[in-house]
Amino acid sequence: MAELHVEIVAVERELWSGDATFVFTRTTAGEIGILPRHIPLVAQLVDDAMVRVEREGEDDLRIAVDGGFLSVTEEAVRILVENAELESEIDADAAKQDSESDDERTAAWGRARLRALGQLD
């Protein structure tokens, strides 16, 4: 099966880099799924986005991202964000508490982490 190279980079670290068969996330224009040989585009991610990376023969990666941008070429997807956490790094209780915050930015970050954990649609 064809693959595309995916890089997810936060301000302080490269979170993940590798090959994937499909990438899904939410942009300000709506949900998007990216397969190899997708048309080139640049899009802004919503503040409470979750990125799902499907890999052949491996479990999907679920990553909470705090805003940022998505760049797509025929061979690669690059996601540049302020902050990001892999599903395995997320504290569910802290994410739930943040999602209930009166501060919209904190609440969005909490929702993104809950989405990555599969606890919010």
Swiss-Prot record:
Q: What is its main location?
A: membrane
Top-level lineage group: Bacteria
The signal peptide annotation in the UniProt record is: none
GO MF terms listed in the record are: ATP binding; proton-transporting ATP synthase activity, rotational mechanism
- A GO CC term assigned to this protein in UniProt: plasma membrane
Q: Does the keyword Heme apply?
A: no
Q: Which family does it belong to?
A: Belongs to the ATPase epsilon chain family.
Q: Which HAMAP family match?
A: ATP_synth_epsil_bac (MF_00530)
Q: What is this protein called?
A: ATP synthase epsilon chain
**Organism (species):** Mycolicibacterium vanbaalenii (strain DSM 7251 / JCM 13017 / BCRC 16820 / KCTC 9966 / NRRL B-24157 / PYR-1)
